[in-house]
Amino acid sequence: MNKLLYLAGRILKPKGLKGELKVLPETDFPESFLQRKLLLVGATEQSAVERRVAGATLQNGFVLLRFYGIDSREDAESIVGERIYITEDDLIPLPPDTAYIHDLVGLRVLDEDCREIGVIRDVLKLPAHEVYEIAAGDKIVLVPAIEEFVVETDLEKGEMTIRRFDEFL
């Protein structure tokens, strides 16, 4: 598989006896699973193979997914722990002033005086809001992804400007 893949979910466990799977969606749009006909499934991006979707439903924040060819609990157990990927073509267009996590990871982080202070390593999803994990020298700093601290995000320049960064050190 040569296309760039994006993590959409993780297979947690079988559900029932007929091959249904409980999936933790790794997306803000779990309902997108309901329209998908094909998904890529594998332990890694490199090992991912296409699987045809036989059905999907949402239940309590999880996706219940069925694939053609996965017809028993034993079949389902054989892919527990694997990841579900989609291609860039399958990404849902975002509203203005929003970005995918993969677009934010790697952005240079600047303070309001345009001094570089680090690089975004990850975006953590916490109950109250997302948090940027920033590698700042030899430290990892967590900054809430809220307007109070984030001045501007410029994906074209590959930069994010943060105010009051010294409060997080």
Swiss-Prot record:
GO terms for biological process: ribosomal small subunit biogenesis; rRNA processing. One of its GO terms (cellular component) is cytoplasm. Keywords: Chaperone, Cytoplasm, Ribosome biogenesis, rRNA processing. It comes from the Bacteria. InterPro entries: PRC_barrel-like_sf (IPR011033), PRC_RimM (IPR056792), RimM (IPR011961), RimM_N (IPR002676), RimM_N_sf (IPR036976), Transl_B-barrel_sf (IPR009000). Pfam families: PRC_RimM, RimM. Residues 95-168 form the PRC barrel domain. It is found in: Cytoplasm. One of its GO terms (molecular function) is ribosome binding. Its main location: cytoplasm. The PRC barrel domain binds ribosomal protein uS19. Belongs to the RimM family. Binds ribosomal protein uS19. An accessory protein needed during the final step in the assembly of 30S ribosomal subunit, possibly for assembly of the head region. Essential for efficient processing of 16S rRNA. May be needed both before and after RbfA during the maturation of 16S rRNA. It has affinity for free ribosomal 30S subunits but not for 70S ribosomes. This is Ribosome maturation factor RimM. It comes from Prosthecochloris aestuarii (strain DSM 271 / SK 413).
